[in-house]
Curated annotation (Swiss-Prot):
PANTHER family: MYOGLOBIN. The modification Phosphothreonine is found at residue 68. It comes from Ovis aries (Sheep). Heme b binds at residue 94. This is Myoglobin. It catalyses: Fe(III)-heme b-[protein] + nitric oxide + H2O = Fe(II)-heme b-[protein] + nitrite + 2 H(+); H2O2 + AH2 = A + 2 H2O.
Length: 154
């Protein structure tokens, strides 16, 4: 399920757009996640009180967390599939502390692709979307495998 060099290049080119405003992209991804899948909000004590999109847009904490999420993901994507150490660390915190199910990783992957396409339609066409989808699926599969090692049934 690996990606070709060309696909990785599409992923990293798209990610370059994210890096121009990691916090802004991250905030939009989390807003898309929480509005599209309100059940995911229950995993975030810090954000449970945010009920509307306007409240989410006004939240500096949400923006900071979006920055944290996409910074970590960017570091993983730049490893081009050689992300074992990063995924192990992330899976430990997401399984043991945060209890984030793999399904929620699918939801955020969809949100990432949606936000990138909405913000950068001319730079994130079908080929780039397909490559990003494959890269995020690889990440999710590796997270799921690590969850299994940890005994987490997420």
């Amino acid at each position: 399920m690996g990606l070709s060099d060309g696909e990785w290049q599409l992923v990293l080119n798209a990610w370059g757009k994210v890096e121009a405003d990691v916090a802004g992209h991250g905030q939009e991804v989390l807003i898309r996640l929480f509005t599209g899948h309100p059940e995911t909000l229950e995993k975030f004590d810090k954000f449970k009180h945010l009920k509307t999109e306007a409240e989410m847009k006004a939240s500096e904490d949400l923006k900071k967390h979006g920055n944290t999420v996409l910074t970590a993901l960017g570091g993983i994507l730049k490893k081009k599939g050689h992300h074992e150490a990063e995924v192990k660390h992330l899976a430990e915190s997401h399984a043991n502390k945060h209890k984030i199910p793999v399904k929620y990783l699918e939801f955020i992957s969809d949100a990432i692709i949606h936000v990138l396409h909405a913000k950068h339609p001319s730079d994130f066409g079908a080929d780039a979307q397909g490559a990003m989808s494959k890269a995020l699926e690889l990440f999710r599969n590796d997270m799921a495998a690590q969850y299994k090692v940890l005994g987490f049934q997420g």
